[in-house]
UniProtKB/Swiss-Prot annotation:
It comes from Campylobacter jejuni subsp. jejuni serotype O:6 (strain 81116 / NCTC 11828). The gene is rpoB. Belongs to the RNA polymerase beta chain family. Keywords: DNA-directed RNA polymerase, Nucleotidyltransferase, Transcription, Transferase. Its EC number is 2.7.7.6. It is an enzyme of class 2 (transferase). CDD domains: RNA_pol_B_RPB2. Pfam families: RNA_pol_Rpb2_1, RNA_pol_Rpb2_2, RNA_pol_Rpb2_3, RNA_pol_Rpb2_45, RNA_pol_Rpb2_6, RNA_pol_Rpb2_7. The RNAP catalytic core consists of 2 alpha, 1 beta, 1 beta' and 1 omega subunit. When a sigma factor is associated with the core the holoenzyme is formed, which can initiate transcription. The lineage of its organism: Bacteria, Pseudomonadati, Campylobacterota, Epsilonproteobacteria, Campylobacterales. The keyword Iron does not apply. This is DNA-directed RNA polymerase subunit beta. DNA-dependent RNA polymerase catalyzes the transcription of DNA into RNA using the four ribonucleoside triphosphates as substrates. GO terms for cellular component: DNA-directed RNA polymerase complex. GO terms for biological process: DNA-templated transcription. It catalyses: RNA(n) + a ribonucleoside 5'-triphosphate = RNA(n+1) + diphosphate.
Amino acid sequence: MLDNKLGNRLRVDFSNISKQIEIPNLLQLQKKSFDYFLNLDNGESGIEKVFKSIFPIHDPQNRLSLEYVSSEIGKPKYTIRECMERGLTYSVNLKMKIRLTLHEKDEKTGEKVGVKDIKEQEIYIREIPLMTDRVSFIINGVERVVVNQLHRSPGVIFKEEESSTVANKLVYTAQIIPDRGSWLYFEYDAKDVLYVRINKRRKVPVTMLFRALGYKKQDIIKLFYPIQTIHVKKDKFLTEFNPNDFMDRIEYDIKDEKGKIVHQAGKRLTKKKAEQLIKDGLKWIEYPVEILLNRYLANPIIDKESGEVLFDSLTLLDESKLAKIKEQKSFDIANDLANGVDAAIINSFAQDGETLKLLKQSENIDDENDLAAIRIYKVMRPGEPVVKDAAKAFVNDLFFNPERYDLTKVGRMKMNHKLGLEVPEYVTVLTNEDIIKTAKYLIKVKNGKGHIDDRDHLGNRRIRSIGELLANELHLGLAKMQKAIRDKFTSLNADLDKVMPYDLINPKMITTTIIEFFTGGQLSQFMDQTNPLSEVTHKRRLSALGEGGLVKERAGFEVRDVHATHYGRICPVETPEGQNIGLINTLSTYAKVNELGFVEAPYRKVVNGKVTNEVVYLTATQEEGLFIAPASTKVDAKGNIVEEFVEARQDGETILARREEVQLIDLCSGMVVGVAASLIPFLEHDDANRALMGSNMQRQAVPLLTASAPIVGTGMEQIIARDAWEAVKAKRGGVVEKVDNKSIFILGEDDKGPFIDHYTMEKNLRTNQNTNYIQHPIVKKGDIVKAGQIIADGPSMDQGELAIGKNALIAFMPWNGYNYEDAIVVSERIIREDTFTSVHIYEKEIEARELKDGIEEITKDIPNVKEEDVAHLDESGIAKIGTHIKPGMILVGKVSPKGEVKPTPEERLLRAIFGEKAGHVVNKSLYATASLEGVVVDVKIFTKKGYEKDDRAIKSYDKEKMALEKEHHDRLLMMDREEMLRVCALLSKAPLNSDQKIGDKNYKKGQTADISELEKINRFTLTTLIKAYSKEIQKEYDDLKNHFQNEKKKLKAEHDEKLEILEKDDILPSGVIKLVKVYIATKRKLKVGDKMAGRHGNKGIVSTIVPEVDMPYLPNGKSVDIALNPLGVPSRMNIGQILESHLGLIGLRLGDQIQEIFDRKQKDFLKELRAKMLEICSIPRLASEKEFIKSLSDEELLNYARDWSKGVKFATPVFEGVNIEEFSKLFEMAKIDMDGKTELYDGRTGEKIAERVHVGCMYMLKLHHLVDEKVHARSTGPYSLVTQQPVGGKALFGGQRFGEMEVWALEAYGAAHTLREMLTIKSDDVEGRFSAYKALTKGENVPATGIPETFFVLTNELKSLALDVEIFDKDEDNE
């Protein structure tokens, strides 16, 4: 059993199998990938590779060359927090050392003869975004995540598809897919000709490509066909007897050279009979003439006397040709009837012959290889003039130039594996052999001998993580730069000596490419930060979309489906609903990604039917053909498989295998699903569709005011808390020395002696989803802490476990129709106790700009605003902290200069006498929007360099400075304490050299002083005392003192740097002189209309909040918290919720029993407690917690017991849940009826409800679809410019569209006047709107409506088409 007691809570674990390995760090894929990209210590980091692939760059005349020497990465300038506040990018600068070499050239030959000059220069590439320790990026102050991409692995793939032209015919294709470069498609057409396409251009016969690669006709025939030699003897055609030619049933009699039949047609030639015939001396057999008639010559036939070519190779034999050939002794034919070959290549030759004939005439070239290269050039670049050398170079560049073509290591490995090649892995371009072997294998596939690939098999799809994606972007940027440098080379004529690397390189190109990727790329996403789970799963997401991936509109059903190889690698449950279903996936819990990008799943080895403890990680390709048993296979105590036949998996099929055949067994049952799905208890009893909704909705749960962990968990909660950055974890073990709201100090000891670690906590920060981010300590002074233990909870965490909801007492029963259609009835107690209350923080910002008429000003002095409307603003015009904000209130006052109208001389005179009037400024203040209500919790003010800071900015600067000073002071005190502890530890080990009085005690020479006495004395006494020790001790003391002085200097430097950054002028966009951000915290209580959900996809809307006294109550008087509709369970088939509520109720009842022991507080209540807890822990199969409880001290036991008194916590891992026997034992222990139901009384009448009701405890979540953020109403507001109709959507303060179908509804009711209003004055009759408003304010009747703007839009559209449209009144005389 692994030590999982790093958490601060004990759970009764129901696992069947003890875990062999820890769940790997959930975020290691991204971390590893980025570290590899930026790792400059080893020469093989991703960034180095990219530079080396682009440099050196030479100019066309070989005069100059630019080489890459080395690169160095700087330190980030601002901290993560500052970047988020100031809207900056958390990044580093990259220093590239570039060498420019100027070559001496020989005037006559133009060859390089030596080096004339070498210059080296460092070039800065600014702003390469740096991954934060929480695996995200801060881009322009916003936290983003780069999602991993799941794309087709480079290599070769063979496919079989239905023909689009011929019905019921299969088409066979092969594709060679590089990571970068031209794709190569081989395909058969309807007439069995093998063609090749390059990059989806026009197809050419495959032999054309082979000729362009330099192969002659005979070579190609020999590569693809077995050559059969036919001997001519006495007018008969004889060939050697080869039994392999007669594998299938034989069409003709086999005769020996004398014409005797040795085997009859229509019978199979068995191996035995063939061997017998060879024994009997059969060497030559007759080759039937009728079969010879449709064969082709493999070599040309030459007349021996004249030397003239009678028949060229690939001549089709007919009777007249055979008559002439009989004069030869022997000739060769291409045996296209052999096994695994067909006539495709011969047909291709027939096709390309015509093309080459035409080209010969037009190009006046005889060499067929050159002609073939020209043909390919013409297909790839139609309409361009061509020279044969250029064409050959072009074909060579397409596939054999490392700059243009890259298969990568993965592609090379896949090619070698599939085609049985042995090309070294560093050859990442194609070879001739690759192309030939691919065509050969495709012919094999067509003839039923090869293996067709499955494009959705995880051996053919790989993961590109952040490091690789960034490397690709960097490569694109550098390639652009390379092109620009080559263009600059050509424009350089004179003064080559004066050129510096900086003149040639423009680093901006690289920066813009990278920033574009982070801001606009499809894979760089705004981080989902609703709760820690949503963050972790976002970073583990695998997307098939993005650059070089699929397009969601075109992705078919097969790509989206669950594949057998997903088992243990990709979660089959968690994927979005909607058009992205199946294209966006998540890694399974235990899955890892190897360095080639393939996903691996863990298994335990099985040897001769015995399960070993060796864990191996295998990719989908490695596990092909192996027999794998499920984790639920019965195994005895020694690890032997019990049953003789086991249900095992092989290549995705389930089969019965003997236990000796089984080679692997699943690590555990839960390895199939991902992180979110493994948080659902009793997942095995839920329908997959509902489990999908359950996993997705847990990611939307809002962090509540007080988090509480689920009574029924799965054991996964602490793993997520362990790997999410929200929690604070101890780096090293020790004892808690000091704790307050903002910091924790831990005192420990290592090889060097005592040390003190310092941890800070963040408070009330806003996340991307506007939820509140807050950390609070969960350890007390004096607690012992292990390394890696959670010492402070983040949001949605409770005692180091994920806690995204609340345990609520629920009853499945209808309640006066209020829980119709999944609605939820909630007790008022839940609202009163703030159970489901959450805090949300909104950020509002306003900027003051520099305009052509003057500068905008942030001020309290606003024209035409009442005094009481600005009472809550301070002198600087910004809302004070603590102000209660209501919709429509001013948050920040701002005035903007009006464009001046030239004043008349009189006005100028009056202004000169009475001073400036506020008449030439306009109110442009920031107002609270319609739905914003809350308290101002923070204000940030940024001022541009050269502009004066206002009072508020100065105050906030002073406040921040004070906080920094306090933190520095605390850390200095702790460092002093650490120094004293180390000194005391040193002195307490060594004997004294003379008699001394230390504290209250006298010591003789040779004695050692007590550490407790040493700790009492002050520093000055220490300096004199140290002289009473040996020279060695004095030296060690001096070393310690120096070490701490250096540490203090470092701390001071760090502090000064922080102060310097604080004092720095703020970086603001051009034109902006001041930026103010106001943060408003809103408390959102549970309301009617809020969406709630359980963990099993059981979601609903709160329909009513009922007084506690009216809710149904239990016999003991306790009323139910929530009433759910029982009809929501059977049709949805998520029975897991029923089992969860049973187990939850058991937890509560057992908690009550523990509380009773506490309440009785008898003499030996500790013994009683321990006995009770042991009894509960002995129910699971493994009973792994028993030993742990026995080993606890009384103090520790009390801690765990107090936690359990509120409800005993269970862990039922997925697929290993509580079984029936355990349930019945638990029911008995908790004194609950076996049907799990109870009597209930109606809260309104006090009568007993007729039926017994299922009451239990379920973990309920409040989701971030809050009614306060959805409800929206408008009277008047903005109108669209062209149509003059109200705009749409809440964000724009728009109206509700009254569409076509709504019009039908009013027509159906005959509501003509209402309908006319809807279509005119309430929509787009501009004049009508004004006149209606006037009439209403004056209390008159609304006048008749005018013409809607839409009509004018239509007539203007017609006018633009030169049609004169006029509008006539009906009353006018008809002219």
